[in-house]
Amino acid sequence: MMENYKHFTVLLDEAVNGLNIRPDGIYIDGTFGRGGHSRLILSQLGEEGRLLAIDRDPQAIAVAKTIDDPRFSIIHGPFSALGEYVADRDLIGKIDGILLDLGVSSPQLDDAERGFSFMRDGPLDMRMDPTRGQSAAEWLQTAEEADIAWVLKTYGEERFAKRIARAIVEHNREQPMTRTKELAEVVAAATPVKDKFKHPATRTFQAVRIWVNSELEEIEQALKSSLHVLAPGGRLSIISFHSLEDRIVKRFMRENSRGPQVPAGLPMTEEQLKKLGGRQLRALGKLMPGEEEVAENPRARSSVLRIAERTNA
């Protein structure tokens, strides 16, 4: 079924241009998806170039396996483990660029069977990799009311988190929730004030999805690993789709673009300062989609691309 879903790769040219591709370079596409970024990277690599792609979605892996190119390899797993994948291939400090396109993809949203969308009724799953971990339904059926409320507040910034959590728990006591339509209806009924521009279940679905897939922890671990695997001059090109993701990326790039923070007046020798090291990244700014791209693909509206370069420190 997956070939029936049209997929737009957001900020395609901009994200790949941000990598500053060298024909003989080694690159990582940490979120293969349907391969839009990977194919463009491959088109710019020479015979000696290499591209390592990663995805934890089995459907994405199936698409990746159709690419018959000796320069390309695919790994089925989370991008948070990119440090391990690189170490296994003896490529630590040799990666020339890492691209991450965060969040859920259009095919995942559009396929009702994946359970990501409140717009289509399907199994309440939401896992990026349906073969591993707890589904959204399983978690909601076993979680405490306070834990559900915390997730909705923390990852969905939902102001009615406590009311919605109570409604979910009460519904599950009477009849275990298994469908996306059920969750959407329970949330809508528990929301006292409706936003005319946004479905009342939007924040809840985002929060549960982020929790089920440990999305923010995945991002933080991948960013941390990037400092170890990138070569000097190597690039990070990262697309985020909501403020929680972008906040993590922005903070990481800002903190690592500074030198070591030493209290004013603290006596230190030149040798001691050298041991602290210099700044590890140089932030190269951010880009957002133009009006034409947003008109063609409304889901691109909230996307932000941030680019940084590894220093010699």
From Swiss-Prot:
The lineage of its organism: Bacteria, Pseudomonadati, Pseudomonadota, Gammaproteobacteria, Enterobacterales. Keywords: Cytoplasm, Methyltransferase, rRNA processing, S-adenosyl-L-methionine, Transferase. It catalyses: cytidine(1402) in 16S rRNA + S-adenosyl-L-methionine = N(4)-methylcytidine(1402) in 16S rRNA + S-adenosyl-L-homocysteine + H(+). Its main location: cytoplasm. Its EC number is 2.1.1.199. Signal peptide: none annotated. One of its GO terms (cellular component) is cytoplasm. Specifically methylates the N4 position of cytidine in position 1402 (C1402) of 16S rRNA. Pfam families: Methyltransf_5. GO terms for molecular function: rRNA (cytosine-N4-)-methyltransferase activity. Gene3D superfamilies: Putative methyltransferase TM0872, insert domain, Vaccinia Virus protein VP39. This is Ribosomal RNA small subunit methyltransferase H. It is an enzyme of class 2 (transferase). Belongs to the methyltransferase superfamily. RsmH family. InterPro entries: RsmH, SAM-dep_MeTrfase_MraW_recog, SAM-dependent_MTases_sf. GO terms for biological process: rRNA base methylation. It is found in: Cytoplasm. S-adenosyl-L-methionine binds at residues 35-37, 55, 79, 101, 108. The gene is rsmH.
